[in-house]
């Protein structure tokens, strides 16, 4: 599901700054004293085991969850957040209707969308390869097709910040490559792109990687951070050896809390 937030409060729109952000959920610290900046024209991957706070951090960036302590400043005026949840209320809608929702504004009736709105929808549909599905009901699509529609909807909004929660999980390789290519293009267009992932090869497409385990374990380039010693600090022995699994020659296989491979 995509959640769109418009907040122009006059703050600096060049980036987002988190200072000592802590989020307490159910008596435990989902995030603990996170201090990090997200700059315009950058892409950041969040990695870490299940329960590490990746989705919580995305929710904080989206304005959906307030920090228990700490501050978030300099937020961009518009955010598009592609979550892992597909809204059931959208299933009877056509792909075109779902995409056009991204262009709705409080002061604009749906049937009053202008040429720029329709152009944005058409461009997003083409970039995600769903233009030929424009009249198809969402409930007739495969999981992968729906995911591409939701990412296309986020692009159609043309928000300044694009947040994606595990966007390529369960997708075929063609869909994965298409979404990764779009993500890189959005970064190059000057947007802030932040995604959570268990795919280390996906994380390598980003400028920076944050390794989370409630706290910020490490931050840096993929070459600096996606190495066994750093990953073991977050995952423990859930990293299966230095070269236990290769994806395109260099990714490591991570396992979840039940010992199952995440790939």
Map each language-model feature to its residues.
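The feature captures the beta-strand-to-loop junction immediately N-terminal to the Walker
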Residues: 47-49
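Helix-to-loop junction immediately C-terminal to a conserved catalytic motif
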Residues: 62
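Conserved ABC ATPase "signature" region
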Residues: 115-133
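Conserved ABC ATPase signature
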Residues: 137-141
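Catalytic Walker B motif of ABC-type/P-loop ATPase nucleotide-binding domains
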Residues: 162-166
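Conserved switch/coupling elements of ABC/ABC-like ATPase nucleotide-binding domains
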Residues: 214-224
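ABC ATPase nucleotide-binding domains
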Residues: 224-263
């Amino acid at each position: 599901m995509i959640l769109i937030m418009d907040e122009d409060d006059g703050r600096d729109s060049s980036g987002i700054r988190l200072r000592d952000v802590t989020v307490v959920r159910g008596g435990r610290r989902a995030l603990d004293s996170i201090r990090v900046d997200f700059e315009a024209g950058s892409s950041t991957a969040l990695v870490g085991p299940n329960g590490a706070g990746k989705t919580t951090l995305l929710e904080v960036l989206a304005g959906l969850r307030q920090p228990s302590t700490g501050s978030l400043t300099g937020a961009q005026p518009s955010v598009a957040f592609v979550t892992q949840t597909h809204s059931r209320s959208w299933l009877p809608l056509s792909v075109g209707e779902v995409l056009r929702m991204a262009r709705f504004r409080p002061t604009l009736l749906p049937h009053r969308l202008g040429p720029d709105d329709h152009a944005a929808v058409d461009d997003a549909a083409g970039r995600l390869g769903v233009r030929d599905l424009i009249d198809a009901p969402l409930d007739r699509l495969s999981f992968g097709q729906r995911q591409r529609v939701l990412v296309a909807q986020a692009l159609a909004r043309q928000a300044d910040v694009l947040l994606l929660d595990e966007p390529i999980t369960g997708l075929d390789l063609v869909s994965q490559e298409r979404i990764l290519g779009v993500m890189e293009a959005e970064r190059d267009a000057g947007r802030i792109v932040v995604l959570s992932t268990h795919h280390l090869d996906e994380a390598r497409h980003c400028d920076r990687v944050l390794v989370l385990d409630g706290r910020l374990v490490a931050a840096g380039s993929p070459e600096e951070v996606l190495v066994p010693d750093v990953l073991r600090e977050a995952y423990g022995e859930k990293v299966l050896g230095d070269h236990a699994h290769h994806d395109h020659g260099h990714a490591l296989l991570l396992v979840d809390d039940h010992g199952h491979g995440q790939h």
